[in-house]
């Protein structure tokens, strides 16, 4: 039998060393990947508990296994809190990820070969919005809209023109690298004009939506998905939301289980419930407001130092920096900043001359540094360091200096304080 005192130390030191090294990296590096954040110890406590052991195929009150009376309560808590947080009538907390939530939406509401209209990956969309390499681009006839290259903003006239031309069954609104506010009423009007469903993927901005600092898509969309990490600061997982519609609710439930998944991850659902409770607290709005202020402060520095911020600035938690003018690649910038313990990700920019493996841009987000306690002053200083490195990318002395400054910041702003 197992002992309550079993631990990794002394049993699997090789694995433990890698895990400890990652913990140290998170403390010693500044995290600017827009899709990453730090979960609270409460969230991790819930995810690391005994619910890991429980199989619970089905939904609360309608399980295919016995012994589910307690996990039913856990899942109902998560559902009720998600509905309250976003003002939704329906919530499904079982998707294992944002991508699996999106796949379930397609499975529920589309047939193979149906036309979908989504944002191009090259212009800031997501793989699951119809990219050719994704199942969403292989199973469905995916048409892509993008940005007006003159303004860096979504070209809603193009969206409408493509919708009228291709008559999609579904229009997808959402992004992975767009720094401005989506016009949900305009998307709804376009969808209604051509008789399409409107599906919103708000994975990146869900925390801002929950705080009332970004428009809520629930009143406009037929279905909404999100991840539960990123700006929500929860565990890695997915969530589907909708207004009351019995037909759509039944289709969505069936698409998640048994259509796309088997047993739900009850320990992750418990962690989602904690995350939603944290997001319902008054302080969560203060956090999200600081996320936006920090992003705006960084964008101002980049623009002031001569870097092109796609779309001209940011309304949310992220920004996309084009390095075309500087003659740099995203890959080189990613590596140089990483050597200075600043973590970003290379990212394609509109009309990128480089391949997706090289790119001409970097994406930067402020959720994680804001969780650490950074405010505008720290973020302006940080943006300046990034510019220092990119301005003199082949000078190792600059990188070494910045790495020392990063270390001071990280010691002053620990991820998990004592």
Curated annotation (Swiss-Prot):
Family: Belongs to the SHMT family.
GO molecular function, one term: glycine hydroxymethyltransferase activity
Cofactor(s) recorded in Swiss-Prot or TrEMBL: pyridoxal 5'-phosphate
Record keyword Membrane present: no
Site (Plays an important role in substrate specificity): 229
GO cellular component terms attached to this protein's record: cytoplasm; cytosol
Function according to Swiss-Prot or TrEMBL: Catalyzes the reversible interconversion of serine and glycine with tetrahydrofolate (THF) serving as the one-carbon carrier. This reaction serves as the major source of one-carbon groups required for the biosynthesis of purines, thymidylate, methionine, and other important biomolecules. Also exhibits THF-independent aldolase activity toward beta-hydroxyamino acids, producing glycine and aldehydes, via a retro-aldol mechanism.
Keywords linked to the UniProt accession: Amino-acid biosynthesis, Cytoplasm, One-carbon metabolism, Pyridoxal phosphate, Transferase
Protein name per Swiss-Prot or TrEMBL: Serine hydroxymethyltransferase 2
Pathway the protein acts in: One-carbon metabolism; tetrahydrofolate interconversion; Amino-acid biosynthesis; glycine biosynthesis; glycine from L-serine: step 1/1
Species: Pseudomonas aeruginosa (strain ATCC 15692 / DSM 22644 / CIP 104116 / JCM 14847 / LMG 12228 / 1C / PRS 101 / PAO1)
Modified residues (N6-(pyridoxal phosphate)lysine): 230
Name of encoding gene: glyA2
Principal EC category: transferase
One biological process term in Gene Ontology: glycine biosynthetic process from serine
Reaction(s) catalysed (UniProt annotation): (6R)-5,10-methylene-5,6,7,8-tetrahydrofolate + glycine + H2O = (6S)-5,6,7,8-tetrahydrofolate + L-serine
């Amino acid at each position: 039998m197992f002992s309550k005192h079993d631990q990794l130390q002394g049993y699997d030191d090789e694995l433990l060393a890698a895990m400890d090294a990652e913990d140290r990296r998170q403390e010693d590096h500044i995290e600017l990947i827009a899709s990453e954040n730090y979960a609270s110890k409460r969230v991790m406590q819930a995810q690391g508990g005994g619910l890991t052991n429980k199989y619970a195929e089905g939904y609360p009150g309608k399980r295919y296994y016995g012994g589910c009376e307690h996990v039913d309560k856990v899942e109902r808590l998560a559902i009720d809190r998600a509905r309250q947080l976003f003002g939704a009538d329906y919530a499904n907390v079982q998707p294992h990820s944002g991508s699996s939530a999106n796949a379930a939406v397609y499975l529920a509401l589309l047939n193979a070969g149906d036309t979908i209209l989504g944002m191009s990956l090259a212009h800031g969309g997501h793989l699951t919005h119809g990219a050719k390499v994704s199942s969403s681009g292989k199973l469905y006839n995916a048409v892509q809209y993008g940005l007006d290259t003159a303004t860096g903003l979504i070209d809603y006239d193009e969206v409408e023109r493509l919708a009228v031309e291709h008559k999609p069954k579904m229009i997808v609104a959402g992004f992975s690298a767009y720094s401005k506010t989506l016009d949900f009423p305009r998307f709804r009007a376009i969808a209604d004009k051509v008789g399409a469903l409107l599906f919103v993927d708000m994975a990146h901005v869900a925390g801002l939506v929950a705080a009332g600092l970004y428009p809520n898509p629930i009143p406009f969309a037929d279905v909404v998905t999100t991840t539960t990490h990123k700006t929500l600061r929860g565990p890695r997982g997915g969530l589907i939301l909708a207004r009351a519609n019995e037909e759509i609710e039944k289709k969505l439930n069936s698409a998640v289980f048994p259509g796309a998944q088997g047993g739900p991850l009850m320990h992750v659902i418990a962690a989602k419930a904690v995350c939603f409770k944290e997001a319902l607290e008054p302080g969560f709005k203060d956090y999200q407001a600081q996320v936006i202020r920090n992003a705006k402060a960084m964008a101002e520095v980049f623009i002031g130092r001569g870097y092109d911020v796609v779309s001209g600035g940011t309304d949310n938690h992220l920004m996309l920096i084009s390095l075309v003018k500087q003659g740099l690649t995203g890959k080189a910038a990613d590596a140089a900043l990483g050597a200075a313990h600043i973590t970003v990700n290379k990212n394609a920019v509109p009309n990128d001359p480089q391949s997706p493996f090289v790119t001409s841009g970097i994406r930067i987000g402020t959720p994680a540094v804001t969780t650490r306690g950074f405010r505008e002053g720290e973020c302006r200083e940080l943006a300046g360091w990034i510019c220092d490195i990119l301005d003199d990318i082949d000078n190792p002395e600059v990188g070494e200096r910045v790495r020392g400054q990063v270390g001071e910041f990280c010691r002053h702003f620990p991820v998990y304080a004592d």
